[in-house]
Amino acid sequence: MYEQRTYRRDIKAGDLVSFQAAVKETDLYIRASRDLSVEAVAAINDVRGPLERYIREHPVFLHSLEPLPVEKDAPDIVQRMAQAARLANVGPMAAVAGAVAQMVGEKLLQSSAEVIVENGGDIYLKVSRKRMIAVYAGDSVFTGKLALEVEPGRTPLGVCTSSGKVGPSLSLGIADAAVVIAPSAALADAAATAVGNMVKTEKDVDAAIEFGRSIKGISGIVIITGGKMGAWGDIKLVKT
């Protein structure tokens, strides 16, 4: 069934070419200096292949809700996901969308100086001018009113969102949006899940922010739940 992804309009980058690339469950919305859809599909296959083979041999990797050790010779994507999961204390699949977005983006940077890859609301970007990323929080009063301003010198960067109310990804919390910024999109993805899991009521926002601050490698957090918002870190929120 097709799921309308309204948040895909929420990055201001009209000077770049937009295109989609999909393989199986992976459905990416990409912006680059030119249409790289063929290259993007090839990159997705290159990234997914080793992960799929690893999961066939280690099915626990797919289902675990806790960090798992992996072999030193495990595929790069598995290593990235496992490391992010250890830092955030979640299962490795909590990092998969961010990891795929980043690894595909890194491959596309060979053909484009600027790349923005969105994978289910999780974003990897390397840009050469200031970009605005709208904060999408479902039916919250904050949706459509706030954006993250990202300076090019801070990229490459991961900007990932976990929600207990929007999207298909597993969340044990009820946050409208738990947004985490980190140089590693895999870590941002895993940490967004961990932070979002802590939010059961509006009263949990401050504690979730404090927990997120303790995760090594995180540079910024925004949590929106109902009428409450909390933020921390090296971020710039602007009104839209």
Regions found by a protein language model. Name each.
Residues M1-L28, R34-L36:
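N-terminal basic/disordered segments at the start of proteins
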Residues I55-P69, E114, T201-W232:
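Flexible, glycine/charged-enriched surface loops at secondary-structure junctions
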